């Protein structure tokens, strides 16, 4: 199998790193997972690299497990970034259609997207994505696919996602030190949404909450395109730290308690259920309801931050597709019930779509971003093959929505 048919998704998180190897032939509709690996993160804080050598060692561990499992020596990786001071702003590109017959070509589409990137990033920031939201031809708005249409002026409204330049530079250094060639960098919650949302959800208007260890990614889709993205500064590890202080146990014990006895909804937890902390380094026996109360408070804070972000962009209680929960932090029981109460939206738990593989990987929310990175990578390969000028493909992002 040629190297072009193999892509690795590398999700570099604060608490863990997931790597997925997938292959796709011309006859396959969806990529097939052929290898995977996971490692405990080191040298990371709030989604950003703070120790390059430590981060590189952890990245190398997950990557090596994945390629050994897949039986390959190496391949390019689509790599996630989940922190580093993310900033989102709207932009616009306007061009005059170049052909004499005024038929819009791929080149015109490329020029419009590049024009939207012409506004430089804020100081100390770097443009990570420039995503098309809406096209306009001669004043006619709401066009999804301008290719082949006739007009004089082509406009595109885009969403530009910027990241701290130092955070990107440090991540690139860590991945390179791990011996991995980066194919592309992608915002982690964007990759997760790419895996868990179907076209109908994107069209209806849907929120994705990618709950990680120290951050929670937020992405909104509406009318088929991305509407907003953000990274919130709280994650499931904050609930673990709350358990450390509340129960007087160490971090490892608190994490184990959260995973084995945790719940995000105290009212549905029986007061008769008890946990013997002596087996976990504690000194007494407590009610399981106490653990649920601590966890619920922290996850409610995460949902409160998400609700404030929805209000800020005018989408609170206005998403017919509801909210989709994913990420390793979403594993805690009854989180969907709490989210429904706090967000006033229908809630579903997201699993990866458009990719096949073992259920323990494809249906594990902790692997959603890594799987989304693989899907993104194969879609970009398709874009590159269909572009008239392949060298410009990196600026196109999701041009698959506009090119048949």
Where are the language model's segments positioned?
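A general structural motif
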Residues: 211, 298-307
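Glycine-rich beta-strand-to-loop/alpha-helix junction loops that act as flexible
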Residues: 79-84, 321-331
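A structural feature that tracks compact, well-ordered secondary-structure segments
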Residues: 217-219
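A cytosolic small-molecule/anion-sensing beta-strand core signal
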Residues: 222
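Short glycine/threonine-rich loop-to-helix capping motif typified by GTGT followed
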Residues: 198-200, 328-342
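Nucleotide/phosphate-binding catalytic cleft detector across ATP-hydrolyzing
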Residues: 1-16, 20-208, 225-227, 236, ...
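Hydrophobic, well-ordered secondary-structure elements that form the walls
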Residues: 306, 325, 373
């Amino acid at each position: 199998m040629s190297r072009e048919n193999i892509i690795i998704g590398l999700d570099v998180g604060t608490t863990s790193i997931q790597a997925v190897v997938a292959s796709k032939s011309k006859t396959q509709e969806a990529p097939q997972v052929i290898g995977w690996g996971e490692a405990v993160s080191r040298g990371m804080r709030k989604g950003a690299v703070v120790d390059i050598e430590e981060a590189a060692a952890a990245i190398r561990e997950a990557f090596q497990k994945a390629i050994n499992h897949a039986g390959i020596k190496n391949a390019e990786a689509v790599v996630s970034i989940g922190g580093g001071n993310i900033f989102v702003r709207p932009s616009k590109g306007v061009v005059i259609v170049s052909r004499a017959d005024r038929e819009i070509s791929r080149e015109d589409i490329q020029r419009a997207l590049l024009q939207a990137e012409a506004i430089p990033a804020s100081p100390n920031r770097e443009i990570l994505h420039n995503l098309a939201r809406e096209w306009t031809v001669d004043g006619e708005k709401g066009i999804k696919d301008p290719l082949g249409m006739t007009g004089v002026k082509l406009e595109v409204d885009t969403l530009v996602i910027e990241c701290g330049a130092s955070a990107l530079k440090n991540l690139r250094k860590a991945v390179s030190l791990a011996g991995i060639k980066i194919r592309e960098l992608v915002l982690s919650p964007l990759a997760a949404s790419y895996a868990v949302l179907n076209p109908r959800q994107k069209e209806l208007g849907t929120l994705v909450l990618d709950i990680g260890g120290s951050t929670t990614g937020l992405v909104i889709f509406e009318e088929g395109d991305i509407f907003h993205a953000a990274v919130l500064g709280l994650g499931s590890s904050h609930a673990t730290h709350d358990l450390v202080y509340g129960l007087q146990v160490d971090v490892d014990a608190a994490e184990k308690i959260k995973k084995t006895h945790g719940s995000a909804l105290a009212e549905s937890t029986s007061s008769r259920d008890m946990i013997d902390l002596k087996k976990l380094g504690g000194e007494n026996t407590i009610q399981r309801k106490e653990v649920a109360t601590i966890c619920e408070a922290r996850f409610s804070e995460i949902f409160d931050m998400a609700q404030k972000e929805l209000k800020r962009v005018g989408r609170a209680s206005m998403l017919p597709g509801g909210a989709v929960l994913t990420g390793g932090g979403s594993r805690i029981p009854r989180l969907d019930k709490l989210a429904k109460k706090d967000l006033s939206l229908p809630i579903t738990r997201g699993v990866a779509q458009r990719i096949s593989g073992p259920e323990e990987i494809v249906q594990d929310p902790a692997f959603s971003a890594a799987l989304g990175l693989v899907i993104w990578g194969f879609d970009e390969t398709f874009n590159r093959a269909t572009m008239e000028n392949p060298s410009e493909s990196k600026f196109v992002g999701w041009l698959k929505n506009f090119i048949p």
